[in-house]
A protein has these predicted regions:
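Short, well-ordered beta-strand segments in beta-rich or mixed alpha/beta enzyme
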Residues: 2-8, 39-66
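Intrinsically disordered, low-complexity acidic/polar segments
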Residues: 15-17, 49, 61, 99
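Acidic-enriched, low-complexity/disordered segments with a strong bias for Aspartate over Glutamate
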Residues: 16, 33, 45-49, 54, ...
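An amphipathic, aromatic/His-enriched active-site/gating alpha helix that lines ligand/cofactor pockets
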Residues: 24-36, 55-89
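Glycine-rich beta-strand-turn "strand-cap" elements at beta-sheet edges
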Residues: 40-45, 73-103
């Protein structure tokens, strides 16, 4: 498993554009193999701060995701409307429970 937590901050007045771009990425991942979790969130106390949690079944799945046309189109556009704050590689452990929202 390969997991990452990415933090980005929308540039002033660009929050809606960040949401539009990332929502498009989320739709794309529904068709990709090897992505177990792909969650986008904002901070409750700072709605211009975005946190993206990705969990891939393998390094190959992550590499394949980053090679998609959608990823290659979205990332440069996203960097125009948001600042990259940081990314943390995570080491998942223990059992996972995933329940889709609204289930």
């Amino acid at each position: 498993m390969h997991a990452f937590l990415t933090h980005m901050r929308a540039k002033p007045g660009k929050r809606d554009e960040v949401i539009r771009l990332t929502t498009g990425m989320l739709e794309q991942t529904q068709t990709e193999d090897g992505i177990s979790i792909y969650v986008f969130s904002t901070a409750k106390d700072s709605p211009d701060d975005f946190y993206f949690y990705d969990l891939y079944e393998s390094e190959e799945a992550r590499t394949a995701h980053e090679a998609t046309e959608k990823f290659k189109e979205t990332m440069p556009a996203l960097m125009q409307v948001a600042d990259f704050v940081g990314v943390t590689a995570l080491e998942p452990y223990g059992p996972m429970k995933i329940t889709p929202p609204g289930s």
